[in-house]
Amino acid sequence: MAKKKTKSPGTLAENRKARHDYNIEDTIEAGIALKGTEIKSIRRGSANLKDSYAQVKRGEMFINNMHIAPYEEGNRFNHDPLRSRKLLLHKKEIIKLGERTREIGYSLIPLKLYLKHGQCKVLLGVARGKKIHDKRQALKDKAMKRDVDRAIKDRY
């Protein structure tokens, strides 16, 4: 039976599918502006990074389609689960990432949501989409490596 993947203590959500769908070329850490009910919900582990992306609008960076479930004990002032959330980066970093994403084929994909010194951070990856044959080849390589490791383990 396969071992269950364990998250590191500060990791709240991870986009594992992104590493399968994209070639990650560069990563950068960014803060995220959240409401009170959002951070409470995130700490409970009810955040989902699947299908989310970041983009530059009017000189600011926003993360879109990141789903944070409504906080159960929240009242009528609870947050919208799919609202755009502002990322906290220096102006030079925003300009640099904006230039990279204007190139054809590049996207900003959130890879991980975690806590660092009590602050919620997002690890963004500058990524280029993989073609279907690249995904198949990666799965074949992974299976071959697993078989080799299993054979070596059985041998000794």
Curated annotation (Swiss-Prot):
Its main location: cytoplasm. GO terms for biological process: trans-translation. GO terms for molecular function: RNA binding. Keywords: Cytoplasm, RNA-binding. The keyword Cytoplasm applies. One of its GO terms (cellular component) is cytosol. The keyword Cytoplasm applies. CDD domains: SmpB. It holds the Pfam family SmpB. Coiled coil: none annotated. It comes from the Bacteria. It is found in: Cytoplasm. Required for rescue of stalled ribosomes mediated by trans-translation. Binds to transfer-messenger RNA (tmRNA), required for stable association of tmRNA with ribosomes. tmRNA and SmpB together mimic tRNA shape, replacing the anticodon stem-loop with SmpB. tmRNA is encoded by the ssrA gene; the 2 termini fold to resemble tRNA(Ala) and it encodes a 'tag peptide', a short internal open reading frame. During trans-translation Ala-aminoacylated tmRNA acts like a tRNA, entering the A-site of stalled ribosomes, displacing the stalled mRNA. NCBIfam families: PRK05422.1, smpB. Belongs to the SmpB family. This is SsrA-binding protein. It comes from Staphylococcus haemolyticus (strain JCSC1435).
